[in-house]
Amino acid sequence: RLRRQRQMCIRDRHEVVHNRKVVEDLKSRGAKFVDELSEIPDDGITIFSAHGISDQVEKEAKLRNLKFFDATCPLVSKVHKEVIRFAQTGKDIIMIGHKNHPEVEGTLGRFPGDSKGNMYLVENLLQAENIEINQPNNLCLVTQTTLSVSDTEEIVLKLKERFPLILEPKSEDICYATQNRQDAVLSL
């Protein structure tokens, strides 16, 4: 309906979700998927994916007068808020996730530049074993929501062993729907 009203093509920054059926349906309705805001005409319309966006992407969209709809998953938004809250208290933050994944890029991009802490990305157990932290006694942990609990379990245990005072979120960051699907596949 919005496309008809504006007679414009809606461009989605990244695929909205990791769901082929949804993506194909949107494509059949004329949606175009782009990687960067520079691929969207000024005054264009865009949808930000469920993976979330960095502060810089949001600022650029506003600066260019793009009409945008933020489809960030509520669980991803929760992680963004945790990062901001932890950063405001000057904590160092470790994020467990995959480099270059849109969700990780968006979450890392929510870390305020004026924080007294630092943000680190840990992708695997080897990195968890070797990471050097500026504030090991003032440290917290967040995770990419689309990882499975089993993917992060060893990493979290290693980080807790190395940094006994590390704070975790009050509730799990892993998406329960993702975990349920992964558990179902494993049970086959």
Regions flagged by a language model, labelled:
Residues 68-69, 82-88, 93-139, 145:
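Internal gly/pro-rich beta-alpha loop/helix module
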Residues 142-167:
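Glycine-rich phosphate/diphosphate-binding loop of Rossmann-like nucleotide-binding domains
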Residues 161-188:
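Active-site rim loops that border cofactor/substrate pockets in soluble metabolic enzymes
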Residues 32-41:
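Short acidic low-complexity segments
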Residues 11-16, 95-97:
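Short internal beta-strands
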Residues 1-10:
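Single conserved hydrophobic/aromatic residue that forms the stacking wall/gate
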Residues 14-31, 178:
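N-terminal beta-loop-helix "entrance" segment that forms/cooperates
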